Amino acid sequence: MNPVEKLALLRAEMKKRHLDAYVVVTDDFHASEYVGAHFKAREFLSGFTGSAGTLVVLPDAAALWTDGRYFLQASQQLGGSGIELMRMGQPGVPEIPAFLRDHVPENGWIGFDSRTISNDFARSIGEKTREKHIRFAGDEDLVDLVWADRPALSCEPVWELDVKYAGLTRREKLAMVRGKMKEMGASVFVIPSLDEVAWLLNLRGNDVLFTPVFLSYLLLEQDTATLCVQREAVSAEIEAHLKSDGVTLAPYDDIYRLVAALPTGTRVLLDGERANYRILQSVPESAEVLDRTSPIQLMKAVKTPAEQENERLAHIKDGVAVTRFIYWLKHTIGKEPITELSASKKLESLRAEGEHYLEQSFDPILAYGAHGAIVHYEPTEETGIPMEPRGLCLADTGAQYLEGTTDITRTVALGPLTDEEKRVYTLVLRGHLQLGAAKFLHGCMGENLDMLARTPLWEAGLDFNHGTGHGVGFVLGVHEGPERVHWDVKRQKRHCVIEEGMIFSNEPGIYLAGKFGVRIENLVVVREAEVNEYGRFLALEPLTLVPYDRDAIDLSLLSSRDVELLNAYHAKVFAAISPYLSGDELEWLKAATEPVQVC
């Protein structure tokens, strides 16, 4: 079936239930960024495969909202579907709550699966539509009725992450969180986020591609903890370990029953941005809801010394693999056929040679030529194209190791470049180097740092429509908060001070539709630089260790400071990576990291 036929079936179900709109989000029951196959309802209905987007279906129309990363991709994939693309944040584009207010009649009904809608999102819709007395119908998943061959819920084995990687024991983490609960006046903490449950319990799983988590909820009290999980996913050994730390098991779907049974006067802590609407609706009226940012977010974001050291080890392994890949790509292009997809598979095979490699950390982006202008392009058998010995290839990839999570982008010259390609590459590199060299007082937020990366681009009248940096989990999600580097303060719901031990990305870019794209990305860890009478200064240490492409640099555009930073980084790369290379690969790395001189 095509999207037109699928939407017709959904509308038939809506009509039976007298629904005036049906909302289908990207999320699973846990507000995860990446979701298992069972939860890809929006993709099933619309054909749009991006990782962010919301579909609203009306009786005679449909619209899909997505952000700037996916404007080009969505416009292509929605063609012929009858679904209007709503470019979020652009002039004249309504937000979803306002759209629903304007298109649903007085006393109408909006349907959705309340397990997939966050409390915050439901509240925002309710506030906008209240004046028209519009009601919610959230008890039924209508997509399930039209998706005949829907994949089952994943139920892969849960495994333990050794404390030598995590740095803190399960008991220590539980005590930390309970201390925060006490400070916040909460007697119960409902934890629906898969990465938070995994981090807190030092457990990992394989229920979500690219993110080592398992389907679960945790109900935490001062003296007890109940893990709602698919029982067959937990071995007897792990269950015994959990029990010894005061954690008991319950069926996965029991979370709603357990919340509904909370006694009168219970003060329930939950994060409305992450808790689904059905959880909130399950809280008894006699209990009090404390809608607060989860304290686990910041705990998880500030990496332990053990996590930081393990991430350094992971990035050396990853740096070796990506360096070998770039060498292979540059020396094979034009001699053997290479497609975007075959290059992607080659890089994965090189990473898999590393000890303790688990999986990729997201769908790899290997984008040649004009595909590089599609910010989150993913090559497939249908879309992948041959690469030629000219122009640029943008490679944004990452991996999961037992020692940590990686995310790197390198834009590689495959042969001769135009002056425009070199100019754009060099401007992006300058912004990347300037942010990487930041030294700043504690108390700064990502919004304070963002302009360092954008200034060389803004001076040239250029910009990019995505964040400059995102937090990265430890053997968890490649994108996490609360830290974020972005200039647009209006978009930020929650602001976060940059703390020592945080790991985030530094990834400016430029995308010229129909031509090419350039992005350069390192992960950095925040460290203390110095303390003096003015305060505590922080700096950024690069974790990613892979050379930039000298063949793509217009040296005339570099300042003396740029050259100093470039040479210092390349010296660090050579020192870390060269012991693991030999022969032609080592000779190439020597040449790729030789100091640059500008007359």
For each of these PLM feature ranges, what is it?
Residues M1-C599:
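Active-site neighborhoods and metal-handling regions in enzymes and metal-associated proteins
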